[in-house]
Amino acid sequence: MARLQKIYNDQVVPALVEKFGYKSVMQAPKLTKITINMGVGEAIGDKKILDNAVSDMEAITGQKPVKTLARRSVASFKVRDGYPLGCKVTLRGAKMYEFLDRLINVALPRVRDFQGVKGNAFDGRGNYNLGVKEQIIFPEIEFEKVDKIRGMDINFATTASTNEEAKALLEAFNFPFKKQ
């Protein structure tokens, strides 16, 4: 069992039940999945660029990413329907908690001038979105072997029904939100 998963079961659930007054521990919000997406627009001209992005994401997550394809043709962008334009990974279970642990304790503190992440990036249904500008904040990526610095979108899907519940869940995992 992952370290954060054990913390969730032993400390986070009782704290959330007490804070929000749930009648059952099953009502406590939980993290269902983490989706990491990397859009690689430069892949239109060179397919090798997308392969480098896929290998970076595989090193970061420990799971092979799925290539995302263009849904429709756009002539002004020189994109045809079905062109590979990026990659994404969906993490669940133990791998999800291990990635969250590495993100909070290792990767985010390595960001230059890091003050914390914005607390207003919730979608209204209890999901949180985080944008990372550089993939080199993860220790699995070797700086010398990186061909280009790419960003990624990280989406945290929870069972929380409100933003307040989702924020309390992520704060219980010591998620580094900015102090208002």
Curated annotation (Swiss-Prot):
Coiled coil: none annotated. GO terms for molecular function: rRNA binding; structural constituent of ribosome; tRNA binding. GO terms for cellular component: ribonucleoprotein complex; ribosome. This is Large ribosomal subunit protein uL5. Belongs to the universal ribosomal protein uL5 family. This is one of the proteins that bind and probably mediate the attachment of the 5S RNA into the large ribosomal subunit, where it forms part of the central protuberance. In the 70S ribosome it contacts protein S13 of the 30S subunit (bridge B1b), connecting the 2 subunits; this bridge is implicated in subunit movement. Contacts the P site tRNA; the 5S rRNA and some of its associated proteins might help stabilize positioning of ribosome-bound tRNAs. It comes from the Bacteria. One of its GO terms (biological process) is translation. Pfam families: Ribosomal_L5, Ribosomal_L5_C. SUPFAM superfamilies: RL5-like. InterPro entries: Ribosomal_uL5 (IPR002132), Ribosomal_uL5_bac-type (IPR020930), Ribosomal_uL5_C (IPR031309), Ribosomal_uL5_CS (IPR020929), Ribosomal_uL5_dom_sf (IPR022803), Ribosomal_uL5_N (IPR031310). Part of the 50S ribosomal subunit; part of the 5S rRNA/L5/L18/L25 subcomplex. Contacts the 5S rRNA and the P site tRNA. Forms a bridge to the 30S subunit in the 70S ribosome. The keyword RNA-binding applies. Keywords: Ribonucleoprotein, Ribosomal protein, RNA-binding, rRNA-binding, tRNA-binding.
